[in-house]
Amino acid sequence: MEVNDTSLHKGFGLDINSQRVFGAQAAISRNNYSKVNASINPSPPRSNDNSNKEFSYSKDVNNNGAVEELSLTQLFEVPSQAAFAKQSSQDISDDELIQHDSRKVISSPYSPKQTHTVLKRLYDRQSVISDHEKLLTPQNVSNSSQILSPFTSLLPSTLSTLKDTPLSVSQNEKNLETVGEVLVPETVAQHRTKFYDYTLDEMENETESGQVETTPTRLATSLGSPVLYGRVESTPPAFLPETSEKQYKRKFSFTEPSSEKVDNTETKFSKKTKNINDENFPNPFNVISSYETSASPSTVIDQSSQVSSIFVNKRLRKSVNNQAISRSDSLSLDTPKIDSLFTRASIKPLKPSQSPNSRRSFKNRVLAFFKGYPSFYYPATLVAPVHSAVTSSIMYKVQFDDATMSTVNSNQIKRFFLKKGDVVQSTRLGKIKHTVVKTFRSTNEQLSLIAVDALNNDMVILAHGEIEVTVPISTIYVAPVNIRRFQGRDLSFSTLKDMKFEETSFLPSHDSQRNRSSLKERDSSFVKKNLDSESNQLIFDDCVFAFSGPVHEDAYDRSALETVVQDHGGLVLDTGLRPLFNDPFKSKQKKLRHLKPQKRSKSWNQAFVVSDTFSRKVKYLEALAFNIPCVHPQFIKQCLKMNRVVDFSPYLLASGYSHRLDCTLSQRIEPFDTTDSLYDRLLARKGPLFGKKILFIIPEAKSWQKKIENTEQGQKALAHVYHALALGADVEIRPNVAHLECDLILTMDGNIVDETNCPVVDPEWIVECLISQSDIST
């Protein structure tokens, strides 16, 4: 074999002058080093003349002490199984190493500590080579095409299938499923320069420039020092490698941590950060945070915005916007504003002059009657006087301090200023009644509108007996019985002239942000369109509404309709129709009487339950029990269109489906006079079960308040009890069948043995009575 370029000697790691071959040092086993020199034919020594084109042979010493020559092909010869068997037969411990030298062979045992030192130096090369992969493949040199792609006839049989055959794995490695560690001669690690004719830096430069490459016949991995090529599997070292600072700077990522599966491509920003790291941070690892490269967070945002949009996300946008708001001039912060990619649209914070309260004066402060529960007179702000289309009288739209909007009559509102001797209550003092001593202003600073009264006072001194206490005037509320003594504080035309009112059309305060269907969007647009013309007409000022459902998800926009009803004077009951009646379970008695309406229901004339279709939901069944109309949402739209409360009969829904009759029944509403109050009509009504005595058997009735109310089954039982009371029956709750006079016995499962021969029914019987609106037992 002839080679025309002497650079091949350098590529193979051959020192021609010293006649040494460092590749011969690669004959390594797991336990020891054994020289495999069987069947090696000696060849004449190589001449020192560099003009000779034939490779020489390096000298070595055999077991008999004779000098032997190694041919070039022996460098690539894989040890046979016989050689491994010969090695394993030798009685040598695992801690013994055989040190190879080109002139002699010396066997010396090494301690585990020294073995660790050898391994440490091996990890300095950043790789571990298994014992069956100890051969070194030739480098890719331009003038060595025959070596890179050897013919079978030119190479030994062990290399004839090297390109297409995977490397063999010993049986021990298959069992252990790991790659064995390699123990290298200490002389290689200590005297590295003796085996190379150029320094490590030169080798790195050639590798980086592409002059030294791996052979395409093997899966090669480039190593640091020395540069070895072969099929290598490595594990992370348990100690810190002794590597130069330059190598760490070259191998660490400076922008973001990434896994091995992600392509860590450097951008302009990362290269810029890398240069900054090299100059200002000479630590061994040179890993810094991006926040240390700039003086302020705004600089970091500006730099990242110039690189790529991948750094932009919703959370970052939101944080930047919040920073811009906090740095606005209105908050008097010295921090400079952020002027970056994310703040192109100027953010205009709400100024004090633009707040809704600024359009009103403290003279607008009133005490208004709250139609919900509990019903007292609370501090509120008068929004505007409105005209009622039903009563043709002036009403007042007010906003309570908790932002609740309501509409009250002229006899349900008073100017909010207190006089000495007024009997009031405070939310900070419980239900105890106190007498007003005096009111005063505690500070000269500008206070919120909800913190003062109509005289711009913010504190009040109250007395209870001989004890006086000072509380904020915004915590005051007055019972309807005591409001009659508030003489001289009615609203008049002269007092209204001094007040400031908003020029508003009372549109819905907000649009629904939930995803609506096209049907819901048409509902909202229709409602808003019909509000623009005569929006000040409170057509629902004497109406109460309860919304059930929708049963179908996209049936109607419930939120928009609730807002429209409230803005037109109506009251929306979120919990159903129960607030209109007394609480039957408040008495804590087992014998319950039929329901009676509360007197506050005198404020309304009509009540409606709105749903898209009939159902067996609680609010819907309550409406059937109280004989209150259940209407379609189209009823509200028609009222807005006609600007008055229209006849509800065309919009009535069915009562429900009767399993007993196997059909759907219509809702039958008794005719009534709309001028009568809701209280009078409910009080005069008698349900279909009026006069009936029902015994409700509940096993936990002995402690029904603790057990029944706190369980799902118990709440269902109480709902059926409430429906029976709404139908006019008297109900008694017992844990078992007692010898009591009753018309029928109601149980949750309907299975009970009764000796009194009373009919036993289940809750479905109550539901059938509600749907049919009659007593089905007769």
Swiss-Prot record:
Changing residue 80 to A: In crb2-2AQ; abrogates DSB-focus formation by chk1, but not crb2. GO terms for molecular function: chromatin-protein adaptor activity; histone binding; identical protein binding; methylated histone binding. Phosphorylation of Thr-73 and Ser-80 by rad3/ATM promotes interaction with chk1. Phosphorylation at Thr-187 is dependent on phosphorylation at Thr-215 and Thr-235. Phosphorylation at Thr-215 and Thr-235 may prime the non-canonical Thr-187 site for cdc2/CDK phosphorylation. The modification Phosphoserine is found at residue 80. It is found in: Nucleus. GO terms for biological process: DNA damage checkpoint signaling; mitotic DNA damage checkpoint signaling; mitotic DNA replication checkpoint signaling; mitotic G2 DNA damage checkpoint signaling; negative regulation of DNA replication; regulation of double-strand break repair via homologous recombination. The modification Phosphothreonine is found at residues 73, 187, 215, 235. Changing residue 184 to A: Abolishes formation of radiation-induced crb2 foci at DSB sites. Severely impairs checkpoint response after DNA damage. Changing residue 235 to A: Abolishes formation of radiation-induced crb2 foci at DSB sites. Impairs checkpoint response after DNA damage. Changing residue 187 to A: Abolishes formation of radiation-induced crb2 foci at DSB sites. Severely impairs checkpoint response after DNA damage. Residues 358-493 are annotated as: Tudor-like. Keywords: Cell cycle, DNA damage, DNA replication inhibitor, Nucleus, Phosphoprotein. Residues 35-56 are annotated as: Disordered. Residues 535-653 form the BRCT domain. Changing residue 616 to E: Disrupts gamma-H2A binding, but has no effect on dimer formation. Pfam families: BRCT, Crb2-like_BRCT-like, Crb2_Tudor, Tudor_3. Essential for cell cycle arrest at the G1 and G2 stages following DNA damage by X-, and UV-irradiation, or inactivation of DNA ligase. Plays a role in the response to DNA damage. Interaction with rad4 via its phosphorylation sites in the N-terminus couples the DNA checkpoint apparatus to chromatin via interaction of its C-terminal BRCT domains with epigenetic modifications on histones H4 and H2A, respectively, in the G1/S phase of the cell cycle, and facilitates recruitment of the checkpoint kinase chk1. The Tudor-like region mediates binding to H4K20me2. Homodimer. Dimerization is mediated via the BRCT domain. Interacts (via BRCT domain) with rad3. Interacts with rad4 (via BRCT1,2 domains); a single rad4 molecule interacts simultaneously with both Thr-187 phosphorylation sites in a crb2 dimer. Interacts (via Tudor domain) with histone H4K20me2. Interacts (via BRCT dmain) with histone H2AS128ph (gamma-H2A). Interacts with chk1. Interacts with sad1. This is DNA repair protein crb2.
